[in-house]
Amino acid sequence: YERQVDQRLKNRLVEFSFPYPNRMELALAPVRVLRRSGIIPLLRKLGVMKLLGNLGDMEALLPPLPPMQKRLKFPVRWKARGPRQASVGMITGCVMQVMQSHVNEATARVLCKSGCDVAAPKTQNCCGALHAHIGDMEKAKELARCNIAAFEDWEKEHGALDAIVINAAGCGAVLKEYPGWFKDDDEWETRSKNFSEKVQDVSEFLDQDAFKARLQDSLR
């Protein structure tokens, strides 16, 4: 029973913080402070980190955290270098954008060098995977509707996107499952199909001859 309670508490913590970058930043603030102070190796030697249990283990597994400003200043629009070959949307993610925003930034630069305009609407949010995994499908669908609408609105204002790319493979798999979440809602099933059909892992998208040739030329 204690384990069930503990697991439920962990689920609620994940549900409350992980899908929301600002809350995640707040939760990670102590880690940033401790790492900047350089005191963590001493705390490990003294056994203090072991006293923190799972939290201490999690800190050891965390990658170097990029500056928060990188996420906050992530451009909404990136222009293709040279002739444009495609317009793509980018799902920046929640955990991905907090912990690895530099990877999203590098991806956007590669896409631009491959001849793509890149759109990263600010109104997008968590894909809903975390809520779906713990059984909160209503919240998962709410987040899905928000993402679908974010890219629909972008296309209405700026024109159609040829693809919607993502770095996080697990989240990408969930984005492709959206139509199955709305089988009892004709309108959103149609809208989610239109969205999901455009979703590709960034490596999948760039593995096309036209983009590979363009990228190779830009690196010479």
What function would you assign to each model-found segment?
Residues 1-220:
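Iron-sulfur cluster-binding electron-transfer modules in prokaryotic oxidoreductases
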